[in-house]
Amino acid sequence: MPIRVPDELPAVNFLREENVFVMTTSRASGQEIRPLKVLILNLMPKKIETENQFLRLLSNSPLQVDIQLLRIDSRESRNTPAEHLNNFYCNFEDIQDQNFDGLIVTGAPLGLVEFNDVAYWPQIKQVLEWSKDHVTSTLFVCWAVQAALNILYGIPKQTRTEKLSGVYEHHILHPHALLTRGFDDSFLAPHSRYADFPAALIRDYTDLEILAETEEGDAYLFASKDKRIAFVTGHPEYDAQTLAQEFFRDVEAGLDPDVPYNYFPHNDPQNTPRASWRSHGNLLFTNWLNYYVYQITPYDLRHMNPTLD
C-alpha cells in the first residue's frame, strides 16, 4: 500500500531506502481514487523513529493510505525538533470536525505513572470520545491499550512488579478471526511494558474477544465484535534494535535492567539482535486495514456511520 505523506517528511527517504513504496502528496494528487484516511496519535518521545516504524507497517497493500500525524501534548519535546512537530503534526482542534477511516494510538513510556498524573490525560479522553463518531476503527498499542481499557471499560490500572521486556511466544485462540487471518498457530512479538493485561481480567470486565495470548495467560490481541476497536499489548512495530536501545539506555541510567527475554542471541547483549516478528507485524496491520477499516468504512466519510451489522 503506498502511504501518502508530505513530501518533506523524513520517513520518505528512510523508507525508500528499504524499498517501501511511499507516495508523496504531490504525486498522489494525480490519482483519482479515495485514499484511506488514517490518523496517528503519536505519544512516543522519539516521534520520528516511531513514524518510521508505523509507516513501514502501513505500506503493504495496493490502496493509498493518507497519513495525518496528531499531537496532543503542547509541552516542548526533548526528543523531537520543534520544527518537525510544527511542519508535520496537527493539533486536535485542526481535525476535530473531520472523519477518518482509521486511528492508531501509539504506546507511551507511562507505565508507572497514574492516569490522572499524565499531563495530557484529559486530551486522551477527549480523543477517545471523539473517535466514537468520527473514526471507523481504532487500533490501540501497548500503553494506549491500558488507557483505553480504563476510559472505555473502567478497568483499573494493572502494573507489573518488574518490567516485561523481550520477545515472547503467543498463540491464536480463534484461527478464523479476520484480524489473525494468515497467522501461524504460534508467533513471536516484542513487549516492553510495565502494564499488565491478564486475559481473565479483560473477560471479566468486557465483551471484547481475545484473539491471541501468551502461554502465561496474558492477552496480546483482542477486539470488539463490531471491529470498531482493536488492541495490541506489545510492540509489533519495533525495529530489530529498539529493545537493545532501551536496554542500554536503562543500563546507562543505572537502573540494572534485566536482559530482554529471547532477544539477544545466546542471551548476550554484545550480540546483534535479529527481528523475529516482522512477518507477524506486517500481517497484523494489513489485516486491520483490510478487514477493520477498508471493508466497513463508507466511501464518503461525510456519511460516516461506522458500525457493522
Swiss-Prot record:
Transmembrane segments: none annotated. Changing residue 157 to L: Lack of activity. Changing residue 235 to A/N: Lack of activity. Changing residue 193 to A: 3-fold increase in Km for L-homoserine. 8-fold decrease in catalytic activity. It catalyses: L-homoserine + succinyl-CoA = O-succinyl-L-homoserine + CoA. Substrate binds at residues 163, 192, 249. One of its GO terms (molecular function) is protein homodimerization activity. Its EC number is 2.3.1.46. It is an enzyme of class 2 (transferase). One of its GO terms (cellular component) is cytoplasm. Changing residue 246 to A: 150-fold increase in Km for L-homoserine. The record marks 111 as: Important for acyl-CoA specificity. Changing residue 46 to L: 6-fold increase in Km for L-homoserine and in Km for succinyl-CoA. Slight increase in catalytic activity. HAMAP family: MetA_acyltransf. This is Homoserine O-succinyltransferase.
